[in-house]
Amino acid sequence: MDKRIAKLLIAENQRMIQNVEMVKRNISFESHSNYVLVGLRRAGKSYLLYQRAQEMIAQGHLPEEILYFNFEDDRLENLQLSDLDAIKQAYEEMYGHQPIFMLDEIQIIDGWEKFARRLADQKYRVYITGSNAKMLSSEISTTLGGRYMVQPVFPFSFQEYLTAQHISLPAQWEYLQNSDLKRAFLEYFHIGGLPELVIVDNQFKREWLGNLYNKIYFGDLITRYGIRNPLAMKTLIRKLSESVKQPQSYNRLANLVSTVAGKVKQETIVDYLRYIKDTCLVFSTENICAKLQDRMSNQKYYFIDNGFLSLFLFDPETSLLENLVAIHLHEKYGEDLFYYHNNVEVDFCLFEHQCAFQVLYSIKDAATRERELGALNAYQKRYPGSKLFVITMDEEETIELDDLKIEVIPVWKWLLTS
């Protein structure tokens, strides 16, 4: 790497990070820890680095102490592992002291883990971002030797979305009719919570989402993994969007994709699902009462942001509702989140936290009400003491049935109070 380019970018970025305006995220950093921030493209990882840089400057650090470097800058080409040392040397020639490293999208450089580990061993303070879920894996944690804290980064929560829209909740908001709140929720429900969408005009939001999806699809999936059957990958993602509410086996997905894209083996589907998850586009839940060997092969799949799911569906309301609940629970509870399927199905359960959730657009239909409450009753018998919830679009009540107490709560209220 030409050190002149590195020095130009270092100085340019030091000016930039001081002046960026952002919505402060509800993520705190320990002052003596190193971090790896992992999440979907455009989920706000870079802005978290800016937030942390501004916090450190407010605490007395000089802007010149911060070495922020974006490895996806279009002025950089064909970066190698050795270029990381060149960037470090360029900074030291400029200032003559140790920087605070903020390395954005470093995963595009093969072997970056070794450099990151060496920096930590040499007592540098380091913050790293990446758009590949492999950076969350135990393998990476082992390579980094426990020297970094790994922080998943998600799109805006509904509360953060309201803050970004400058909508504040009045006292006793739970009991008031608030048109601004409801309007903001419906937009968040359909368009999602990617931070940059807040400043995009409404008429262009769907186009912006489509462009980002194409970048993930072509850049992070087709090109990165050398996919030889792009139609199969495209079809698989669409089939996942159409089946958000149902468990899907590898064999069923292989059959569905094969009807469109030619014969696709089950092993290929397993690989493709792993790639899709690695981009942080999709996550999954397992059946808590299935045998261990069956859990992986019959999962439910959800999209990490409702905006992407909206791109695929013509009548998306019920799917978007369950997907949004899944996002919230996944962000809060991670791998503790399951579904329950044993003759009856409960959409989400948190065994360790003694909670179970059904998701229904409306609970007014008598047959639907009987079926879904019956499933919660069956779950309660198997896991006594669980708190039971029904998340709806806009209905609220408390149901007391025999020994059961079930809270029915609108999703917009649940997102702000749970």
Question: Could you describe each region identified by the protein language model?
Answer:
Residues 37:
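Hydrophobic anchor at the beta1->P-loop junction of P-loop NTPases
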Residues 13-32:
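Pre-Walker A adenine-sensing motif
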